[in-house]
Amino acid sequence: MPNLGVPELLIIALVIFLLFGATRLPNAARSLGRSMRIFKSEMDEMKTDGDKKELAEKQAPTAEQQQAQDLAQPKSEQPNEHNA
């Protein structure tokens, strides 16, 4: 695959400028920028959702272990008035 140098990139930019015109290029760039921001925010949201799920999965076994420990420990009986 050939390497693109500065002259080739300038020719490509000129062709794009001629195809889309001076009025549509800024709008296209703005639209592309908005799309990139939305994409990045969605990716960050997906990462935080994944972190929350991992944290919940780590905490869930500890809650189950706590319930198992509560069931395994015998409850001490309080002396009643009837037993005295």
Swiss-Prot record:
GO terms for biological process: protein transport by the Tat complex. The keyword Transmembrane applies. Keywords: Cell membrane, Membrane, Protein transport, Translocation, Transmembrane, Transmembrane helix, Transport. It comes from the Bacteria. Residues 42-84 are annotated as: Disordered. Residues 62-77 have a biased composition (Polar residues). InterPro entries: TatA/B/E (IPR003369), TatA/E (IPR006312). GO terms for cellular component: TAT protein transport complex. The chain crosses the membrane at residues 1-21. It is a single-pass membrane protein. One of its GO terms (molecular function) is protein transmembrane transporter activity. Its main location: membrane. Residues 42-57 have a biased composition (Basic and acidic residues). It is found in: Cell membrane. Belongs to the TatA/E family. The Tat system comprises two distinct complexes: a TatABC complex, containing multiple copies of TatA, TatB and TatC subunits, and a separate TatA complex, containing only TatA subunits. Substrates initially bind to the TatABC complex, which probably triggers association of the separate TatA complex to form the active translocon. Part of the twin-arginine translocation (Tat) system that transports large folded proteins containing a characteristic twin-arginine motif in their signal peptide across membranes. TatA could form the protein-conducting channel of the Tat system. This is Sec-independent protein translocase protein TatA.
